Amino acid sequence: MRVSNILFVAGSASLALAAPVRENKRAASNGTFTFLGINESGPEFGETNLPGTLGTDYVWPTLSTIDTFLPKFNIFRINILMERLTHDSMTASLDATYLADLKKTVNYITNKGAYAMIVPHNYGRFSGSVISDVDAFGTWWSNVATEFANNTQVVFDINNEFHDMDQDVVVKLNQAGIDAIRGAGATSQYITVEGNSWTGAWSWKTSGNADSMGDLTDTQEGKLIYQMHQYLDSDSSGTSETCVSTTIGQERLEAATTWLKNNNKKGLLGEFAGGNNDQCKTAVKGMLDYMKENNDVWQGALWWAAGPWWGDYMYSMEPTDGVAYTSYLDILASYA
């Protein structure tokens, strides 16, 4: 989501955009998708105040709300900031407090049998600058993956929504992340990669992603997933509660679906949402129905987003009175 275009009133915060467990994965009850879940937002808030103060600049998910989504939903995408784990540089030591809070959240989720996806919500930036040091980026991921290498239900998401970057750099950063994670001993976990141009599904073939991202390699068979995001407003930014049409969800996935099939790749819709109105609800259901029909390539989807500081945000899935929680929860659960 292009959160730089949105202003949220979320408490006093400004918005930014492990222990081993038994392998008791929660799968969708009717086999529709491998993954169906929710983004958890808050640890990435307050990106202009680094490292920031917990409770003032950023917040961690309220763990008890995870139980509200189980057993229908089996994956939670935890949005963090790279700079809060390594303050001064990507190769710095991990901050013990932020890491401990991340582990607490991850372990709570995975001990419930669900997947916890860790994603640096950094848009391919570190401390405000586009990441170009591929080796340092790999070091960051090596250090982080080492902490979760024994937790089979962690999913690693290389970076949230690269944009306005040299395509070759985006590919190299993704590959460096994959290699670093595997090199750290995290060999059983899924990894999701993201493309340039906000990793949009609708622009996957026109952005350069289709021409270059397919060459990524992973030593672990069947564990690499291409994560795309898709919103249904006029510019796909997720900044409006208005959806273009009742069929826009399916339409914006069609070209990407063809690419996934033609290239023998697996896809995941890591962010999606729609406004609280009939047109959007029909569009969201149409999109999920289309993904269900093509679940040979589409592995699942995650709603954007839950989190304790969303207030009356139009897409809030925060229990129990979030706008989307009261209007979309049953719709999404029907695909579990």
Model-inferred region functions:
Residues M1-K25:
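Fungal secretory targeting signals
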Residues L17-T34, N39, F45-D57, G311-A336:
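Extracellular low-complexity, O-glycosylation-prone Ser/Thr/Pro/Gly-rich "stalks"
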Residues A27-M213, W298-Q299:
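Active-site mouth of glycoside hydrolases
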Residues E44, L232, G307:
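Short loop/turn segments at secondary-structure transitions that flank enzyme active sites
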Residues L54, Y58, T139-S142, T146, ...:
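Extracellular glycoside hydrolase catalytic/binding regions
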Residues F272-A273, W304-P308:
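Acidic carboxylate-rich catalytic motifs and surrounding loops in phosphoryl-/glycosyl-chemistry enzymes
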